[in-house]
Amino acid sequence: MKVFDYIIVGGGSAGCVVANRLVSAGKRVLLLEAGPRDNTPFIHIPATFVRVLGTKRTWMYETEPEPGANGRVLVVPQGRTLGGGSSVNAMIYIRGQAQDYDTWRDLGCDGWGFDDVLPIFRRCEDNGTLAGD
C-alpha cells in the first residue's frame, strides 16, 4: 500500500500548483482528478477548444432560469481534466478587475488588494513579446 503525506482532490490549476509545490518540498502527494489527462489536441489549440465542451473533459453545469436573461437557463462549462478550467478556456488569461480585489481588501481580506496581488500576476505572466502592465 502506498502512503502519501497529502491527498489533493481536484487536478485543476490550484490543485496542480499545490501538488507541485509539495512534491518540490519532498512530500509524497496523491493528486485525484475526476476527468482524464489533458492530452487531446483540442485543449492545446485555441480555436478548437469548443471540441472539448460536452465531452468527458468538462462538466456542463446549468443555472436556474435567469430573470436577467429572459428566463433562459445558461450552460456553464467547467473543466473535468488535469488543469481544470484552465485546460478548457481557449488558452485565455484575464486578470480580474482591480476594483474587485480592492473590495475584498476593504471587506477585511488583508493582502488581497490589487496592489498586493499585482506582483503575483506579473510573476505568473511570461510573454516576452508583449510589454506593459
Sequence positions of predicted segments:
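N-terminal redox-cofactor-binding region of secreted/periplasmic oxidoreductases
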Residues: M1-D133
